[in-house]
Regions:
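An N-terminal assembly and electron-transfer interface module characteristic of large anaerobic redox
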Residues: 25-362
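Sec-dependent N-terminal signal peptides of Gram-positive bacterial secreted proteins and lipoproteins
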Residues: 15-16
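A ubiquitous, low-specificity "background" feature that marks scattered single residues
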Residues: 10-11, 332
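Bacterial N-terminal signal peptides that target proteins for export
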Residues: 1-10
Length: 362
């Protein structure tokens, strides 16, 4: 996703510009899968900032083609945690196996809670080691034929998506008579067992997330970040996030953040550890090109990009200061709307609007 790269750039810049001498600190990192954005890019950025990064063997991690191995990853943690000064962990990996596994698993709630309990036990055994954790609210995609959703999503994904949109709208503002009729027809058009499977998995995942929020309240996590993976204004993901906010409404934003994104979260938490450990208070100013700027709502997200950037700055331990910032973040938002990554408008080329924006930065 284009804007996930933007936020990854934000935290990478945070590490590089506010970097002071790092005295060979070691971070134990459990990524959400083995993709470069989750593993290689994150490790490389942290190492360039002076950190040693420990990661599980790649064959233990989730991919698009096979499940992650949480039991083996937990054994690896047990054998390596004493070498680390801090831990940055994907709860999706430790509980479900990985990001994709969180959408497809068939594990019982008892098994999931057993794995989740091990996080608490890790903190109890090593209370002096800060744990920075990140998880996701399961996404609600319009369609998927890449094997990263349950098998029935290839055929029924758009139907499930529209059911979720209408149910969220019903819960939030209500439906018109025509929309109520449409919702009934959509539910009747899909085998009941598929809907039950999808919603039952979400119910289990939601219960796990509620416990993770409790762990944050109990100071098991130094900081917990909850990402909304590929969401829209109306969706099952947006509705779950709305209700989960009641569970953490009394928590400081310096303890828990919830906002769109998934791929950038590990790097964000490494930057947060860097800020905490060095007792820094970085300040930012954000500038935008012509167009909707901060009011742009990216595809697959449920809120304006300006709000999301501000939440990322808070999550990394920074504040906005337009007068004397440590960092000026230039967010290259589109003139109108965001495009799909494969569309011609997103090909790498020198565009007049981009040239003008870069010139204004200089």
């Amino acid at each position: 996703m284009k804007f996930n790269k933007l936020f990854a750039s934000l935290v990478a810049v945070s590490l590089s510009i506010i970097n002071i001498h790092v005295s060979a600190k070691t971070i134990l990192l459990v990524p959400q899968d083995n993709r470069p954005v989750s593993l290689a890019y994150t490790v490389s950025t942290a190492e360039k900032a002076g950190y040693t990064v420990l990661t599980p063997p790649e064959q233990y991690l989730s991919t698009n083609h096979h499940q992650g191995l949480p039991e083996l990853i937990w054994s690896w943690i047990d054998n390596n945690i004493e070498k680390a000064d801090a831990a940055v962990i994907s709860t999706d990996t430790l509980i479900y196996g990985g990001l994709v596994d969180s959408r497809k698993h068939t594990d019982s709630i008892d098994k999931l809670m057993y794995r989740e309990k091990r996080i608490q036990q890790l903190h109890e055994k090593f209370p002096q080691k800060p744990i920075y954790a990140f998880g996701t609210i399961m996404r609600t995609p319009y369609a998927s034929n890449t094997g990263v959703e349950p098998y029935y999503y290839t055929k029924y994904g758009p139907t499930i998506y529209h059911i979720a949109v209408l149910q969220d709208k019903l819960d939030k503002v209500g439906l018109t008579p025509n929309e109520e009729k449409q919702l009934t027809q959509l539910k009747a058009s899909i085998p009941t067992e598929y809907l039950q499977d999808w919603f039952n998995r979400r119910e289990k995942n939601n219960a796990i997330t509620q416990n993770l929020i409790k762990y944050t309240k109990d100071n098991i996590f130094t900081y917990f970040c909850l990402g909304l993976d590929d969401s829209t204004v109306y969706s099952q993901s947006a509705m779950e996030a709305r209700y989960l906010k009641n569970d953490f409404k009394n928590l400081s934003e310096n303890k828990l953040g919830a906002f769109p994104g998934a791929d950038q979260l590990a790097l964000l938490l490494i930057a947060r550890y860097h800020v905490d450990d060095n007792q820094l208070s970085p300040t930012f100013n954000i500038i935008y090109p012509l167009g909707r700027g901060e009011d742009t709502i990216p595809s697959y997200e449920s809120q304006p990009v300006g709000k999301t950037i501000a939440q990322h700055i808070t999550a990394v331990g920074g504040t906005i200061n337009i007068n004397t910032p440590d960092i000026v973040l230039a967010a290259n938002t589109p003139l109108f709307t965001t495009k799909e990554s494969g569309q011609f408008a997103n090909f790498k080329m020198s565009k007049p609007s981009t040239k003008e924006f870069v010139a204004s930065i200089k």
